């Protein structure tokens, strides 16, 4: 009886994964067709936007400016 329950649980899991595969492929296709072309901030909002501000993007010789231009491209408008 235990093995029958295990088989049903496994079959249910496989059915759920295969049903979601089509949705995942649609989401992946939408991300590939995104107009930004993959240009995103490489760090979360707590760094790109709070700690590093858009004013840092135009600072030519500072460490924060170099960091912003390299890792916060979407925030700086380099896309």
From Swiss-Prot:
UniProt propeptide residues: 20-36
Gene Ontology CC entries for this record: extracellular region; nematocyst
Keywords, in A-Z order: Nematocyst, Secreted, Signal, Toxin
Location(s) in or outside the cell: Secreted; Nematocyst
Disulfide-bond pairs as recorded: none
Signal sequence bounds: 1-19
GO molecular function: toxin activity
Main location class: secreted
Keyword Lyase: no
Record-stated family: Belongs to the sea anemone 8 toxin family.
Name listed for the protein in its UniProt record: U-actitoxin-Avd8b
Organism annotation: Anemonia viridis (Snakelocks anemone)
């Amino acid at each position: 009886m235990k093995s029958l329950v295990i088989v049903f649980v496994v079959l249910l899991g496989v059915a759920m994964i295969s049903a979601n595969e089509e949705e995942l492929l649609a989401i992946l296709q939408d991300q590939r067709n995104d107009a930004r072309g993959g240009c995103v901030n490489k760090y979360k909002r707590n760094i790109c936007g709070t700690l590093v501000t858009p004013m840092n993007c135009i600072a030519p010789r500072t460490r924060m400016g170099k960091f912003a231009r390299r890792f916060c491209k979407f925030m700086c408008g380099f896309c």
